[in-house]
């Protein structure tokens, strides 16, 4: 299995931002130079990038179609992108706009049957399921929903197995407690997922801070890692991460 580094940009109101643990009230701005940053990813040798529409994630209705198209045409990057995907037409339109892969998050928790139907329609290489998780006091990985204020009926384990059995290929999993904290990814979580669903290509997300974290994700058998804050704040050099 090849290992992919996904440099990431989260966009809100046309600006590159980062949220701390997904909290819109704890937002850091990094400028509005989206296309130049994407070009820099490509210049460093990246093949893929991860693009998140935070406006759509909150209100629905993907807003980055034009930006996505510009990035795909100008840089040649394969773009994995999502935010606010609510319907089959959302998936189709984002793919038509230039996405290589569409990320489906909260809907994948709320309506797995619908999303499994999309897997069969669009193909496993065109969709990534993104599951945000938090470990409860009993050690169970739960799936917070509705802005992380409620907990889904299904656990992470149950949903990961369900999607794996349905033919899912790409799973992006974020430990909410690590997101934006630069505290290192949760190695135990990803080892658990790899053991539970070895057929899935698991992407590490949340907490990556240095080359050791990238190397650890690769050594653990994960398929890739999403790098956001560490790149934006200069804690990690993309060239070195790609060569890891």
Curated annotation (Swiss-Prot):
InterPro entries: Aldolase_TIM, His_biosynth, HisA_bact_arch, Isoase_HisA-like, Isoase_HisA-like_bact, RibuloseP-bd_barrel. Its EC number is 5.3.1.16. Keywords: Amino-acid biosynthesis, Cytoplasm, Histidine biosynthesis, Isomerase. The active site is at 10 (proton acceptor), 132 (proton donor). Pathway: Amino-acid biosynthesis; L-histidine biosynthesis; L-histidine from 5-phospho-alpha-D-ribose 1-diphosphate: step 4/9. One of its GO terms (biological process) is L-tryptophan biosynthetic process. PANTHER family: 1-(5-PHOSPHORIBOSYL)-5-[(5-PHOSPHORIBOSYLAMINO)METHYLIDENEAMINO] IMIDAZOLE-4-CARBOXAMIDE ISOMERASE. Belongs to the HisA/HisF family. This is 1-(5-phosphoribosyl)-5-[(5-phosphoribosylamino)methylideneamino] imidazole-4-carboxamide isomerase. It comes from Xanthomonas oryzae pv. oryzae (strain KACC10331 / KXO85). The gene is hisA.
């Amino acid at each position: 299995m090849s290992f992919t580094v996904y440099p990431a940009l989260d966009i809100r109101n046309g600006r590159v931002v980062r949220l701390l643990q997904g909290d819109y009230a704890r937002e850091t701005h990094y400028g509005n130079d989206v296309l130049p940053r994407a070009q820099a990813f490509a210049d460093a040798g990246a093949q893929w990038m991860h693009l998140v529409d935070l406006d759509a994630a909150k209100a629905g209705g993907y807003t980055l179609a034009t930006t996505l198209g510009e990035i795909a045409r100008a840089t040649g990057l394969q773009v994995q992108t999502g935010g606010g995907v609510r319907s089959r037409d959302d998936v189709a339109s984002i793919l038509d706009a230039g996405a290589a892969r569409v990320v489906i998050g909260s809907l994948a928790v709320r309506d797995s049957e619908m999303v499994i139907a999309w897997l069969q329609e669009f193909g496993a290489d065109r969709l990534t399921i993104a599951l945000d998780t938090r470990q409860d006091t009993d050690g169970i990985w739960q799936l917070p929903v509705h802005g992380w204020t409620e907990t889904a009926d299904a656990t992470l384990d149950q949903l990961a197995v369900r999607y794996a059995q349905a033919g899912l290929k790409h799973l992006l999993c974020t430990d909410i407690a690590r997101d934006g904290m630069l505290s290192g990814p949760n190695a135990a979580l990803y080892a658990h997922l790899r053991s539970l669903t070895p057929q899935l290509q698991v992407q590490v997300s949340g907490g990556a801070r240095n080359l050791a974290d990238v190397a650890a994700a690769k050594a653990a058998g994960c398929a890739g890692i999403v790098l956001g804050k560490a790149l934006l704040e200069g804690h990690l050099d993309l060239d070195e991460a790609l060569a890891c």
